[in-house]
């Protein structure tokens, strides 16, 4: 028996990076995984990787910034699989730049995807979790939700909001069987970080000097974060709710 055997998991941002790794890791431990992403081809590719292992997955195109699409994702998941046990709110955008030059469009998109989208989908899934008297929500924040960096003012603000959203949901539903926790990754080797790296002089320069801000001396790998997602989603974390866990190679210890 897997650690999340026969549970139904929705993973957003499942086309690549941490979302892809989390979808695969949950499936490896027995979950039926809905791979949701705006990029349908990417979501389908992740689902096919899971199915190739003889496991259960499906792909779903969703723009989480659209509340109606979030409602549809939850409803269709319930119709197809009969429950919603795990929600991994991983989808996000990082559009770095100098703050006073940041357009309204970038501010709105960042907040709509990183904050409102997470709220929309959680709101859509929680009623079923309440009926089941069980559920685990894992929100992907960032180390930049705790400490900021140059060019990340708007992104950091959005990820800080994720931290407080996580704590609020945890408190609202702690006695009703639903747990909610957040993960704050450090610099992980995923496409979402590449634009920021360009502003810092390029990916090679960042990785050559990574020990200066990430003491472990290397970028994280998506699967390393996925292991933590699995733990928080499983019964092994049954006493953990409202927690904000850094997985940052020592960055926050500096």
Task: List each model region and its residues.
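Active-site loop immediately N-terminal to the catalytic Tyr-X3-Lys motif
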Residues: 99-100, 147-153, 175-176, 217, ...
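Substrate-binding pocket helix/loop in short-chain dehydrogenase/reductase
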Residues: 98-99, 106-111, 210
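Residue(s) in the substrate-gating loop at a strand-loop-helix junction
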Residues: 142
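Short, small/polar-rich loop/turn modules that mediate ligand/substrate recognition or access, typified
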Residues: 88, 174, 179, 240-242
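Short C-terminal tail/terminal secondary-structure segment
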Residues: 147, 229-230, 241-254
